[in-house]
Amino acid sequence: MLSKIVGSVIGTKNDRELKRMRQIVAKVNAQEAAISALTDAQLRDKTAEFKSRFDEGASLDSLLPEAFAVCREASKRVLGMRHYDVQIIGGITLHEGKIAEMRTGEGKTLMATLAIYLNAISGKGVHVVTVNDYLAARDAELNRPLFDFLGLTVGVIYSQQPPYEKVAAYQSDITYGTNNEYGFDYLRDNMVFSLAEKKQRPLNYCIIDEIDSILIDEARTPLIISGQADDSSATYALINNIIPRLTRSTDEEANKENEDGDFWIDEKNRQIEISEKGYEKIESFLIEVGELGENESLYSPIRLPLLAHVQAAIRAHHIFIKNVHYIVDNGEVIIVDENTGRTMPGRRWSDGLHQAVEAKEGVEIQAENQTLATTTFQNYFRLYDKLSGMTGTADTEAAEFKSTYDIDVVVIPTHKPIARIDLEDQIFLTKLGKYKGIIREIKEIQAKGAPVLVGTATIEASEELSYLLDQEGIKHNVLNAKQHEREAEIIAQAGSPKAVTIATNMAGRGTDIILGGNWQAHISDPDNVSPEEMQRLKAAWQKKHDEVLAAGGLHIIGSERHESRRIDNQLRGRAGRQGDPGQSRFFLSLEDDLMRIFAGDRVVNMMRAMGLKEDEAIEHKMVSRSIENAQGKVESRDFDARKNLLKYDDIANEQRKVIYSQRDDLLAEADLKQAIEAMHRDVYDALISQFVPPGSIDDQWNIDGLEDELESEFKYYMPINDWLDSDRRLDEEGLREKIVQTAIARYRERRELMTPENAAQLERHFMLQSLDRHWKEHLTQMDQLRKGIHLRGYAQKDPQQEYKRESFELFQMMLGAIKSDTVQDLSRVHIPTREELEAMEAERLAQAERQQMMFEHDEVDSLTGERHSDPDVEARNLAAEQQATATKAPAAANGNNPYANMNISRNAPCPCGSGLRYKQCHGKI
């Protein structure tokens, strides 16, 4: 209350920002007369002039008024659209690295061209991020004529894109693509073996469309590149047979004390817990089928993976619901995004959940994957020098944007006042009663001649409503994940008079519903339409448009409240675009998940005490407040979860930055001799300490063991006993130094047998191979540590501090292992000729190309890892199969083995980088 009073007196922060920006808008408008007098050639030459001024030291801020005026004039000439003043405010917001909240239909795509143009002048590249490939391609093609006119290049990145095309797209002044593709390209760039293979330039400036969807809804979404791990499909099928034998607790709260069931479910967090009785029953079954020994327990460390299978199976059967969280199509389990209602083909939950659902549905169980590289959207997008975004709904999450990304939200005023009427919610006792109320409302809206869009949270709800409308004889269209092929056609006509469209949350974010329908959709051949036909279609559309306006515009019906107010606002925002009339209302029931789980008993008891009939509704502020409080609780819980995840991921992110920085240094460094010699000192020193402890006397030394270990590890015998016999003064420190110097001298001798270029190439190859192999294993260890770290809380320890400490220890061990493997490989390997090195590199590139093709192909069938309790948060995962799959037919099989003369141990990793042992790859007989 106090903040409202103060705001009314001195104005809000948003008001002050708008006031400041309007002064800049005035400067842009002051340039309009002079800029509009320029010829096309003179207008085009302005870009080169701006670039020259920038190179000479002018800031982008100083260029803004004139550059925006140039972009607006070019848009007017090329696209036939002139930026409104509010769109210029939006452009300023984006340029300043803020989020522009702009209502649906206000022209976000056109607004963004201003900030894109200005920031492209720097020559460092601008990345425009969209939520799917269609929108990236659409926006690029819409704006390409404008940017071509202004002398800027435009590129689009997409999955399965040939490498040379992707490089060209990233070298363009402006690059369009999806958040997934940018993130995966970043990870792929940090898996290459030469700088020439990298695709991305340094990350400069980024504009994210629908930024709330990407940085809030998908913030907990890890981007994962993975390869196939061991197949355990038989175990999933076996565990699936246990679940029908288990009994769910009838009283979830009492169960923890009385154990009246085998497991209970935490619906709020979508997790399960198994009772002691349940553990005993599961163990008995596993012993019965031979999966568990007589004296073994599920609690034993070696059996924890089996326990994870059981937990995943229970979640699959009792938490994840068909046609709500996933659908089954052509024998495949496909995830449904609960935020958008879209299916996500190829994405898979991780931690065995997807395989458990496949076992439950009786379809083919696909193999699990192993993580090769990973990051999160939170950490990836924070790598940009400047980050901005736009959406229709961001203000409710302004605090999170500020605390996590240090970005402010500016609410951009609409060009015309909003004419949409948002009616009070109607609450019913039962879901069926709610559906009856919705159908009654649809009939009333149709009688007026207005179109209606019914938003549902799940596919199941959309199909239930569709069935009831069929029973009433009401013609309608259904837009959900099962009909996504018809999305464009359905959305195009959703604004026609009396049209009824049922849609899940996927209902075309990024696509406007035009009142009267889209007349252009009726043109079958755009290249051959006559002017008369076009005029006829426009006239017919105008008649329908006027009819819908007279009927009150598009009417929105929400079939239930989403857990997030932002998603509800997105649905409301489908109506009332650009000052059009419209109406919205939500219909709720006590059986809705949000009401059932979060609404207080007081609300439920009050409604039941009123004696309402099934299809009677109430509108009450207390109920509305209760719903808003419930949504606030969920949003707060989700914010805390994202914030908590970020704390953990920040620890992993620091390690990731160190590894990727080392990789870049390796790729860029021409001479690695000093680095390799330093590695020799570290590795030999550590090994010596195992047999000659620091500060020890000679009676404590194990010289025979040291000689054997050095010969075994490095294929080089050092006569240490002879040294000691011939020099009685050789103490522990002197002996240590003599061994290290001997090892370095041998390295130098072997290196002299090669040219400096050949030596650097071989050293770089082994160092990168070792680094990548151990980083992959480290990611798996970090993942396992993260899953169990919460248990430290029971020992009165801070899980986050424990994770930080242990992950650092693991990281130190990994760095030591990288050095050790590199020194071992270089000590053992046969000195290759130039021809052998060229053959080795050619084979690596050929394999990389094979892997890239499989990698890109599998991106369509990508793997989504469900890493959190909330099922609408899935981890992005490309099932790259980079390791075993790409080398199923190694070159050795046809006699082409570039490593044949290199004296490589058959159990050593293959030098080609496949991840297989040499005997299983190029050393295959």
UniProtKB/Swiss-Prot annotation:
Reactions catalysed according to its record: ATP + H2O + cellular proteinSide 1 = ADP + phosphate + cellular proteinSide 2
Coiled-coil region(s): none
Keywords from the UniProt entry: ATP-binding, Cell inner membrane, Cell membrane, Cytoplasm, Membrane, Metal-binding, Nucleotide-binding, Protein transport, Translocase, Translocation, Transport, Zinc
E.C. number: 7.4.2.8
Binding annotation for ATP: Q87, G105, E106, G107, K108, T109, D512
Residues bound to Zn(2+): C910, C912, C921, H922
Major localization class: membrane
GO terms assigned for molecular function: ATP binding; metal ion binding; protein-exporting ATPase activity
GO CC aspect terms: cell envelope Sec protein transport complex; cytosol; plasma membrane
Pfam families for the chain: P-loop_SecA (PF21090), SEC-C (PF02810), SecA_DEAD (PF07517), SecA_PP_bind (PF01043), SecA_SW (PF07516)
Cofactor binding note from Swiss-Prot or TrEMBL: May bind 1 zinc ion per subunit.
Membrane topology of this protein: Peripheral membrane protein
PROSITE patterns noted in UniProt: SECA, SECA_MOTOR_DEAD
Function as written in the Swiss-Prot or TrEMBL entry: Part of the Sec protein translocase complex. Interacts with the SecYEG preprotein conducting channel. Has a central role in coupling the hydrolysis of ATP to the transfer of proteins into and across the cell membrane, serving both as a receptor for the preprotein-SecB complex and as an ATP-driven molecular motor driving the stepwise translocation of polypeptide chains across the membrane.
Protein family membership: Belongs to the SecA family.
NCBIfam families for the chain: PRK12904.1, secA
Subunit structure, interactors included: Monomer and homodimer. Part of the essential Sec protein translocation apparatus which comprises SecA, SecYEG and auxiliary proteins SecDF-YajC and YidC.
UniProt protein name: Protein translocase subunit SecA
Naturally occurring in which organism (per UniProt): Psychrobacter sp. (strain PRwf-1)
Classification lineage: Bacteria, Pseudomonadati, Pseudomonadota, Gammaproteobacteria, Moraxellales
